[in-house]
């Protein structure tokens, strides 16, 4: 089905800079995120006539409700989308609309030197005859997750205007700081008030995320000894070299650029240093909890061995878990996954449940007592200048959400 207000909403939202900041001490991490939520999202919800619209200051989230239109109890379903965008230029986004794509040509990003090439991004070929939306080459688009925000709004608009579609109470949430991994930690599950939910933050139509990485992160702070190179023999300890030596003891294959499918990895995010001091930041990913623990233990053992060789704690390790594979918990709630599967199939989609090589807010929320798989939103090539979405994919997301609302009510009779 086509939804005439979806594209204008999306274009409006992507032009608002709501980039999060992992180095911030405030929550939400940026004032611009909070302004986007309060001044744009809340106003649009009010115009749609939803109920219980409020900003939860502690959670940094906008909450709203689509009231039930049936006279019997239905499990309360929720949908979530995040308001922030990733760590890439988000200022002055200029969306470009490419109608009736021919499925073969390169798509120039604005007037820039950059192109979306189907030889590099073969998914483009699937969208022959459809409308591709890109940025202009110097920013990201913000499809992740302003696709989801636009779809939640359009879904709400449709249900409010079509009482013939029977559904129970539906809760909506617009959350901050997903891209930096801190938004879900503060989410108020009780205030949200749903029995189960879905994040709307996935890729191409058919993608259903019910299996994610388990994740940890760690940092190393290395204290070196700086001595003039002329007299350094036997005295200098180069902190940068110590960092290199540590990194080279991790499995060479287990890096993002060498892995796919269900393979995990160690990923060096940053390495800053001088002879005197170095700082390394890593993330660890594995689909199995045991595998995650094995990787963490390997890091600890390497650090211990190197410190033992130095005879002092020259390398300081800080490590913490981030989230766990939602599949382990969703095994107890397969009726929720089945609801999504059935809605996909009813809308003519082939369900793709390949493991998600990442995490979503739902990964954490599931372990906070809110079972929360992820459904597709039409996001492609997220987090950079080559990001794009497809208008027809966004339409299909709304179709699926409407069908899920109907099925949830039917099954409660």
Swiss-Prot record:
Thermoactivity: Optimum temperature is 25-37 degrees Celsius. Thermolabile. Approximately 45% of the activity remains after incubation for 15 min at 45 degrees Celsius.
Top-rank taxon of the source lineage equals Bacteria
Tell me where the signal peptide lies.
Answer: none
Q: What keywords is this UniProt entry annotated with?
A: Aminopeptidase, Cytoplasm, Hydrolase, Metal-binding, Metalloprotease, Protease, Zinc
Q: What regulates this protein's activity?
A: Totally inhibited by EDTA, EGTA, and 1,10-phenanthroline. Strongly inhibited by divalent cations such as Cu(2+), Cd(2+), Co(2+) and Mn(2+). Partially inhibited by the reducing agents 2-mercaptoethanol and dithiothreitol.
Q: Give me any GO biological process, just one.
A: proteolysis
Required cofactor names: Zn(2+)
Q: Where is the active site?
A: 84, 178
Identify the residues that bind Zn(2+) 2.
Answer: 144, 179, 383
Family statement: Belongs to the peptidase M20B family.
Concerning Pfam families, the annotation shows:
M20_dimer (PF07687), Peptidase_M20 (PF01546)
Record-listed E.C. numbers: 3.4.11.4
Species name for this entry? Lactobacillus helveticus (Lactobacillus suntoryeus)
Annotated Gene Ontology MF terms? metallopeptidase activity; tripeptide aminopeptidase activity; zinc ion binding
Reactions catalysed, semicolon-separated, are:
Release of the N-terminal residue from a tripeptide
The reply to whether Protease figures as a keyword in the UniProt entry is yes
User: What pH-dependence text does the entry carry?
Assistant: Optimum pH is 7.5. Highly active from pH 6 to 8.
GO (cellular component) term, any one? cytosol
* Cofactor binding note of this UniProt entry: Binds 2 Zn(2+) ions per subunit.
Residues involved in Zn(2+) 1 binding: 82, 144, 201
Where is it located? Cytoplasm
Instruction: Give a short account of what the protein does.
Output: Cleaves the N-terminal amino acid of tripeptides. Shows broad substrate specificity, exhibiting maximum activity against hydrophobic tripeptides, with the highest activity for Met-Gly-Gly. Therefore this enzyme may play an important role in flavor formation during cheese ripening. Is also able to slowly hydrolyze some hydrophobic dipeptides, but displays no activity against tetrapeptides and the tripeptide Phe-Gly-Gly.
What does the subunit comment say?
A: Homotrimer.
Query: Know the name of this protein?
Result: Peptidase T
């Amino acid at each position: 089905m086509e939804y005439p207000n979806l594209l204008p909403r999306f274009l409006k939202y992507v032009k608002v800079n709501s980039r999060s900041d992992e180095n911030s001490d405030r929550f939400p991490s940026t004032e611009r995120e909070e302004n986007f939520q309060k001044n744009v999202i809340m106003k649009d919800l009010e115009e749609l006539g939803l109920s219980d619209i409020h900003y939860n200051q502690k959670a940094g989230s906008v909450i709203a409700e689509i009231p039930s239109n049936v006279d019997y109890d239905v499990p309360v379903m929720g949908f979530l989308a995040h308001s922030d965008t990733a760590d890439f230029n988000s200022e002055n986004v200029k969306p470009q609309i490419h109608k009736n794509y021919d499925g073969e040509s390169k798509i120039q990003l604005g007037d820039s030197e950059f192109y979306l090439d189907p030889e590099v991004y073969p998914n483009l070929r699937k969208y022959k005859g459809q409308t591709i939306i890109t940025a202009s080459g110097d920013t990201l688009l913000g499809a992740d997750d302003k696709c989801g925000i636009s779809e939640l709004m359009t879904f709400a608009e449709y249900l409010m205007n079509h009482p013939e579609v029977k559904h129970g109470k539906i809760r909506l949430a617009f959350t901050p700081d997903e891209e930096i991994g801190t938004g879900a930690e503060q989410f108020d599950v009780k205030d949200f008030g749903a029995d189960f939910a879905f994040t709307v933050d996935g890729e191409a139509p058919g993608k259903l995320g019910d299996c994610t990485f388990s994740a940890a992160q760690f940092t190393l702070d290395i204290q070196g000894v700086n001595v003039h190179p002329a007299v350094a023999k036997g005295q200098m300890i180069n902190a940068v070299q110590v960092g290199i030596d540590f990194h080279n003891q991790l499995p060479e294959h287990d890096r993002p650029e060498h892995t796919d499918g269900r393979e995990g990895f160690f990923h060096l995010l940053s390495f800053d240093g001088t002879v005197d001091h170095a700082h390394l930041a890593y993330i660890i990913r594995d689909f199995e909890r045991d595998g995650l623990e094995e990787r963490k233990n390997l890091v600890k053992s390497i650090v211990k061995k190197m410190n033992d060789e130095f005879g002092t704690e020259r390398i300081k390790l800080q490590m913490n878990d981030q989230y766990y594979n939602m599949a382990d918990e969703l095994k107890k709630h397969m009726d929720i996954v089945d609801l999504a599967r059935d809605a996909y199939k009813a809308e003519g989609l082939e369900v793709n449940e390949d493991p998600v090589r990442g995490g979503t807010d739902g990964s954490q929320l599931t372990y906070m007592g809110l079972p929360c798989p992820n459904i597709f939103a039409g996001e492609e090539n997220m987090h950079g200048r080559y990001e794009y979405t497809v208008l027809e994919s966004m339409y299909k997301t709304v179709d699926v959400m409407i069908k899920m609302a109907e099925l949830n009510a039917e099954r409660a009779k």
